[in-house]
């Protein structure tokens, strides 16, 4: 093993150990782990200039995003999804578009960014983080319908935001994209991703029917998560929707099997995998955030944060009918690693690239701390802890 490889492995192991330690501390103080991980990472990164052992970008997404998305989709409540399908679709598609355009309109109104660049920024920060939200909801007694809406919306929202990011990137790059062309591209990317995920899940299910060993089911689900994502990405459709569809379809098909022990083993594996990936990704997210840069453009930062949270408040009236549900929905709109990865993956030639990255740093940090920190405490106050469930 070369020195560089050994150093990278050691750095990754150290990051993992630190992430797990911080996650355990977060559980003790009842703060969402994602919040404490990012705050600790930002302090270490800004004060001691510690960098993660990998760079944020498409390669990172291909490694960490499939298992994180798969685990959330694997554990989602399908019965509640069916009941709330209309609300979820409204929030995920028109809702994400509304959020992106509202943020873009605010930034262009105060003249910190031209509208095409502002729309690119809006698309980036419209991607909420399902992992951080799910981690909180598993410890509280929130209504099943509200949980399903927030979890499914955050999954679908990420997929829509990534597609919109590609369209906005083409606009900023000088390509002429008519609204109907963009709409068609969005529909094809989402539909294509769902189709790819479904087509990948069916042969996986047929293969797993012949095997009664839990370790084969675990290996099969891991392979499926990556295969669906990579095939979809290769075909130019949504990898996030492909991975989500693959998990949902395979889970629905496997439910009919009688071997509950195997399913429990698969559940335990994915919970552990998500916990580890969550710890690494969010601590690395904090290390990437440069605190001085996050306040470098105060007008852009203030406008972006207010517009981001404000658009979430407006969508809360679609998500829930009562004050507790709306408050929970607003606070669950945390941003995480995906917006950072999208911002840092921007080509160098993109106008105002540095300002976009600075603004994304700020939005991710503020939404995680301001919205994420009180989330679990308030949801517990509204609905009670999980142990109160009858």
Predicted regions and their residues:
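Transmembrane helical cores of multi-pass secondary ion antiporters/exchangers
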Residues: 1-390
């Amino acid at each position: 093993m070369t020195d560089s490889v050994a150093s990278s492995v050691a750095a990754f192991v150290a990051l993992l150990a630190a992430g797990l330690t911080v996650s355990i501390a977060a559980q003790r103080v009842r703060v969402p782990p994602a919040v404490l991980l990012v705050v600790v990472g930002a302090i270490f990164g800004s004060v001691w200039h510690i960098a993660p052992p990998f760079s944020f970008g498409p390669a990172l997404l291909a490694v960490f995003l499939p298992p994180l998305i798969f685990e959330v989709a694997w554990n989602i409540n399908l019965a509640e999804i069916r009941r709330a399908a209309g609300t979820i679709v409204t929030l995920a598609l028109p809702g994400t578009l509304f959020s992106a355009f509202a943020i873009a309109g605010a930034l262009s109104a105060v003249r910190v960014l031209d509208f095409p660049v502002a729309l690119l920024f809006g698309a980036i920060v419209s991607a909420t983080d399902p992992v951080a939200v799910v981690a909180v909801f598993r410890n509280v007694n929130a209504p099943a319908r509200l949980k399903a809406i927030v979890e499914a919306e955050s999954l679908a929202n990420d997929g829509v935001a990534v597609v919109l990011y590609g369209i906005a990137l083409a606009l900023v790059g000088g390509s002429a994209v008519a609204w109907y062309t963009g709409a068609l591209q969005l529909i094809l990317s989402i539909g294509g991703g769902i189709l790819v995920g479904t087509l990948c899940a069916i042969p996986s299910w047929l293969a797993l029917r012949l095997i009664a060993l839990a370790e084969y089911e675990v290996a099969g689900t891991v392979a499926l998560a990556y295969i669906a994502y990579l095939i979809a990405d290769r075909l130019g459709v949504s990898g996030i929707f492909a991975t989500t569809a693959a998990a949902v379809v395979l889970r629905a098909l496997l439910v009919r099997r009688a071997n509950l022990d195997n399913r429990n083993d698969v559940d335990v594996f994915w919970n552990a995998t998500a916990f580890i990936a969550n710890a690494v990704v969010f601590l690395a997210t904090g290390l990437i955030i440069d605190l001085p840069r996050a306040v470098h453009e105060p007008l852009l930062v203030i406008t972006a944060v207010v517009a981001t949270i404000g658009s979430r408040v407006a969508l809360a009236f679609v998500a829930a009918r009562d004050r507790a549900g709306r408050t929970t929905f607003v606070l669950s709109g945390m941003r995480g690693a995906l917006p950072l990865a999208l911002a840092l993956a921007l080509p160098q030639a993109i106008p105002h690239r540095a300002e976009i990255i600075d603004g994304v740093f700020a939005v991710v940090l503020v939404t995680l701390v301001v919205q994420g920190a009180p989330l679990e405490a308030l949801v517990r106050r509204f609905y009670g802890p999980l142990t109160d469930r009858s």
